[in-house]
Curated annotation (Swiss-Prot):
Keywords per UniProt: Cytoplasm, Isomerase, Manganese, Metal-binding
Name of the molecule in the record: Phosphopentomutase
Molecular function, one GO term: magnesium ion binding
Task of the protein: Isomerase that catalyzes the conversion of deoxy-ribose 1-phosphate (dRib-1-P) and ribose 1-phosphate (Rib-1-P) to deoxy-ribose 5-phosphate (dRib-5-P) and ribose 5-phosphate (Rib-5-P), respectively.
Major site of localization recorded for this protein: cytoplasm
Protein source organism: Bacillus cereus (strain AH187)
Sequence similarity: Belongs to the phosphopentomutase family.
Amino acid sequence: MNKYKRIFLVVMDSVGIGEAPDAEQFGDLGSDTIGHIAEHMNGLQMPNMVKLGLGNIREMKGISKVEKPLGYYTKMQEKSTGKDTMTGHWEIMGLYIDTPFQVFPEGFPKELLDELEEKTGRKIIGNKPASGTEILDELGQEQMETGSLIVYTSADSVLQIAAHEEVVPLDELYKICKIARELTLDEKYMVGRVIARPFVGEPGNFTRTPNRHDYALKPFGRTVMNELKDSDYDVIAIGKISDIYDGEGVTESLRTKSNMDGMDKLVDTLNMDFTGLSFLNLVDFDALFGHRRDPQGYGEALQEYDARLPEVFEKLKEDDLLLITADHGNDPVHHGTDHTREYVPLLAYSPSMKEGGQELPLRQTFADIGATVAENFGVKMPEYGTSFLNELKK
């Protein structure tokens, strides 16, 4: 008999809670995503997260301890060697990643692009982090006139290749992306995802077509999601979760346009009758505010998210469990534009916790979440991680 019929796992993308013990190895000494945002805002207003025990993990400006937190609380340390989204999420579901995925804030190395040019017979232009629409405005006309390939990246571990469908036929663009995928499996490039970005239209009026194709990496082993799916449990992936695991172990995928849309979809799944896992990633914190080093926007987004939690609390049933965590840090007042190596918060709440919660021991790996989910549903336990299921008292 499952202790909880439904588990709702929410990953607040990049919401770290202070430097990890190994932060120095990553150039991240002093990083503190929520703490620095709270200082910048002169106090963060997150009353619902505070009720769950956020301030009991650590007090910050505006975020205080409460005498009787509704849920259980602690922080988790990442065991894997990366600090990117895929590494964090894969570890949450029971895998360790020894080779970090690479990000390319200065563009890709010349030797990689030389090899790609040689193997495809087409010249490469761009080679920098950019938004997909802006790069088309800048280079779309040149691409059409020369038949070259627009290669660009983002703050994530991606290599994107854009070409006009009438200049580079789709079949050829897909072949080119497969070549890029092969080349970037090399450890020194290790890119999480290669994306074909075809477009149409005229200069000044280009649009990306729905013929996008992703060449992702499958997780390097079986995750708890695979075990759930194979045992006929539901695994509902909301936001970019399905992309992060390349669809592995997912039974239903709900796309999102924003954090608020993500919260809407979470409420939708709360209204669904299912047995298994609902897994949401809220990416705006990271993509719109962390990488852009915008502490004000980040703080406002955290407060907006917090204001949606009462809808979630209201719909949770006695045999539901809500788990809230993050996948890495991205301190908006830290140097650079990259993620930061931090502890992440963990909050666990169910309406059945009539006496409220208390502190859980510090988690030595994000995989403790996967182990807890696996134990709850009686599926094969991941190789890594220690379940805290029995520490959650009703």
